[in-house]
């Protein structure tokens, strides 16, 4: 029997340290697609990518999504990547992938080759949004406000003369404490807050385990604010939210443990600051050619009234504690409608 429902390929998992977070996000999206009015419009097809990079069929993928024990006895029917263009039942791709190979432009290029629309930014916006060094270079060219930073590559760590110049830059430009981050990871994975040269050296070595490119940023004592972006030809910004946490900084544990962090939505800000953040969020996305959906993170120093753009996340999380869907719900857009809007925007 002919069906006019659109088939949505929900792709999740992946070769990334954020694999488990991706599964949680995908479960939220998958359930939203099967909710009330969306159920009449869409058919959700989960597609799991395991930690080795193999793609799996719908049955196996659904068993992973809902942690069904019987997935252990399923025959692993892997999908041949050469046949992706022939997956005629997929109308729109919905990536729920985080980190390398998922939100860095790699899979976006693959989706583009199938000729089917996909949710989120294209190859360029995804790549720039993933690499913090490249992203900050673009922000600098657009004169967007950001904290002082320096960057280095993993091979440079062994060069004593080069590292001596880095230490001098830390003292002159950055100062302690500072953050050392892998350039291409999210969810605070691989990050260290260093209060001394010794901690800085340890942080560099730690970050180098995750990435060849490393960024060092000045630590700003201020409020951490976030704003959601939705749209392509016309971008809209959500209300501004604030993240508070019990840890020294917004660690992986505090991001995904409700007992260690809390959110205030909307944030308690005067209207001028709130409007400025919403405007800067759109400007940041346009600068790196990000569209569809994004979450833009900020630092705000009340004493100076200074706003700093931290980063643009082009595939923000969709877990129960994730800010992006929560920000939009507070803006009047419920999860089910948000997911439907993202699919329709992808087809523009």
From Swiss-Prot:
- The regions listed as transmembrane in this protein's record are none
Q: Where in the cell is it found?
A: Cytoplasm
Please share the entry's free-text remark on the cofactor.
Binds 2 magnesium or manganese ions per subunit.
Question: What's an example GO BP annotation here?
Answer: peptidoglycan biosynthetic process
- The residues that hold ATP are 171-226
Pathway linked to the protein: Cell wall biogenesis; peptidoglycan biosynthesis
Residue span(s) of domain ATP-grasp: 136-344
Q: Which InterPro entries match?
A: ATP-grasp, ATP_grasp_subdomain_1, D-Ala_lig_Van_CS, D_ala_D_ala, Dala_Dala_lig_C, Dala_Dala_lig_N, PreATP-grasp_dom_sf
Write out the residues that bind Mg(2+) 2. Answer: 311, 313
Q: Which reaction does it catalyse?
A: 2 D-alanine + ATP = D-alanyl-D-alanine + ADP + phosphate + H(+)
What is this protein's record name? Answer: D-alanine--D-alanine ligase
Identify the species of origin: Prochlorococcus marinus (strain NATL2A)
**Lineage from the top down?**
Bacteria, Bacillati, Cyanobacteriota, Cyanophyceae, Synechococcales
